[in-house]
Regions:
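Short glycine/proline- and acidic residue-enriched helix-loop micro-motifs
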Residues: 109-128, 217-220
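Phosphate-coordination/substrate-recognition cap region in phosphate-metabolizing enzymes
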Residues: 37-109
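Short basic (Lys/Arg) and small-residue
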Residues: 154
Length: 225
């Protein structure tokens, strides 16, 4: 199974430097709306076994152009799944605050250096977030090797999934960058997950998904596509 991970496009809160978390009515910015249209073109046309989307408006707005212009035209009865397990981190009382102000809190160092130990006041822990996100991935990984699933979620959620895929401890997940409207692709068809694409904002994803399957048994770096 190949898993396409998409972070929502640039949002109104991104533009303001605000940690929106799960606050309602946070929509895409004008920049984000343009990104969502370009994303639809980049994704192109490929069969989707499942499309799972965070409940936050900005995530559905990000994928809507592709869903409406490509997926539903080919499969009119296809239904995306709004999955609360892929929701943004519950940042609790940090939600709605300026990142510049939050960076001055003593807990900020924990977020950056030991995120597995961070539990947001009146919210959830980063480790809890990873656990719920990975429960979705483990379910999708049961799909046949030939299938492709798509997740539309948030930066920290996707970073935690990528960290797990490459066997990196959660405390190191801040080393991973996931930009708005970026696409990452993981392959779960082998013994261990593999990263095919990471934080990409330019590639034509269809070309990657339609490329010949890579060998499950690699030694010496493999022969490429």
């Amino acid at each position: 199974m190949r898993l396409v991970l998409i972070r929502h496009a640039h949002s109104q809160s991104n533009a303001l430097g605000v940690l929106s978390g799960r606050l309602p009515h946070v929509h895409l910015s004008e920049k984000g709306m343009k990104q969502s249209q370009l994303l639809s073109e980049r994704l192109g046309n490929f069969p989707v076994a499942q499309l799972r989307v965070s409940p936050m408006e900005r995530c559905f707005e990000t994928i809507s152009p592709w869903l409406n212009d490509v997926v539903l035209k080919n499969s009119p009865h296809f239904e995306p799944i709004i999955d609360p397990l892929l929701n943004e981190v519950d940042y609790g009382s940090w939600s709605g605050k300026k990142l510049s102000a939050l960076s001055r809190k003593k807990e900020w160092r924990t977020v950056q250096e030991s995120p597995s130990r961070m539990y947001f006041p009146d919210g959830e822990g980063i480790a809890q977030m990873q656990s719920r996100a990975m429960s979705v991935v483990h379910e999708l990984a049961k799909l046949p090797d030939s299938k492709t699933a798509v997740i539309v979620s948030h930066g920290d959620v996707i970073k935690s999934i990528v960290a797990s895929a490459i066997g990196t401890h959660l405390d190191e997940f801040q080393r991973i960058i996931i930009d708005p409207a970026s696409v990452s692709v993981l392959d779960y068809s082998g013994i261990k997950p593999r990263v095919l694409l990471l934080n990409d904002t330019r590639a034509v994803v269809t070309d990657l998904l339609q490329a010949p399957k890579r060998s499950k048994n690699l030694l010496g770096g493999g022969a490429g596509k």
